[in-house]
Amino acid sequence: LGKWRNEDTGAMDLTECKIVYVAPMKALVAEQANHFRSRLEPFGVVVNELTGDSQLTKAQIAETHVIVTTPEKWDVISRKSSDTSYTNLVRLLIIDEVHLLHDDRGPVLEAIVARTIRRMEQLNDPVRIVGLSATLPKYQDVAAFLRVDTACGLLYFESNYRPCPLRQELIGLSETKAI
């Protein structure tokens, strides 16, 4: 966001920049939208949620700087080739729980990423794609799919980076009893 911030006034000029945050569940969408709203509102950044339960008009979408949405809803929005005025302004696509690429929702996330990359290549207009996950054992594969430059654009934090230590234990059971 700093790229679009006026250093003198602190105001944000986000008329040419939109951010999309994709979260897997409506509850997480609502939680993240509220969190972002409380943090970004002082800078004049408009955050809205867009799910199957919450609708936005075209005018509301145009006024929104950060859309927090589900994969299915963003898939529908970004697939519409008749109205690309909003999707062409997306400069940052954040996919939370990106490990779900290997789940039932994987094809929807793949379509979103592929569409974003294709649009980027067609318009020669860069979009930063960020994947977030707390459990991603094969992060190199996901990085390759997201076309991350692993020399400078891949950030991987091991468990010792956690602010509070994680204790792991393995408990062996020799016998199971039915309840």
Q: Regions from the language model: what does each represent?
A:
Residues 1-178:
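Conserved P-loop/Walker A NTP-binding site and adjacent catalytic elements of P-loop NTPases
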